Amino acid sequence: DDIPQAGINYCTSENMQMDLRKQKKAVGGYYASVAYLDAQVGRVMNALEKSGKRDETIVIFTSDHGFHLGEHDFWAKVSLRDESAKVPLIISVPGKKPAVCHSFVELLDLYSTLSSLCELPKQDRLQGKDISPMLDDPSYEVREEAFCVAPMRTGFLLRNKKWAFIQYGEKLPAKLKGGFEHGRNGIELFDMEQDPQQFTNLADTLKYQPVVQSFRKKLQDKLVTIRNCDLKNK
């Protein structure tokens, strides 16, 4: 009851007519797909080894979105919960030692990172960040938080180690309520330390209103920043 309508994935068990048998089949099918993908990645890596080009090739494994397998009674993608918004990211660079990094990054960062690794000229106008320092220092912090968008529901996510803030809707027309209202379709706030599976929305809890207002202002500033780009005059 504490989740706004805009935050409910349209691919629910009810909408998808997913009884228990179908749910088990879907999960099994997903695991099978992952196993198949793993085998194909292995084929690519073996081919690189045989070609003699492994030591001069940068390999990046990632995806454009995650996937729900029944969490929150959601299926497929589209939501801004962790299961859907987080993606795998594995980078293999010749001469770099294996490591695990925990900094927040965005897919937007990959272009800047590859440009740096390939020693291409730096472009200051890019919004993505070079994450290659993590390859030498796994503790390196690229971003304090990540930003994600679900355009179909005008949803915005700001995610840091402590909080996941999700806002649906950006503003009302000026003729309504005398001006702008951010988050007109609802807001979600999750304590990722105490509630990592995102079960309890704290957005309407009086105690956390300073946190909500801080994120609303932060998101407003973020949207202004990212829209100040080469496309604005196109």
Which residues make up each language-model segment?
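Active-site-proximal cap/lid insertion segments
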Residues: 1-104, 117-125, 174, 180-184, ...
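Non-transmembrane alpha-helical segments in soluble domains
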Residues: 31-34, 38-45, 49, 111-115, ...
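C-terminal cap/loop subdomain of S1 sulfatases and analogous C-terminal strand-loop tails that border
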Residues: 65-71, 92, 97, 106-111, ...
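Short amphipathic beta-strand/extended segments with alternating polar/hydrophobic composition
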Residues: 102, 167, 201-203
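Intrinsically disordered, low-complexity polar regions and short flexible loop motifs
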Residues: 195
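Short amphipathic alpha-helical coupling segments at ligand-binding clamshell hinges
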Residues: 211-215
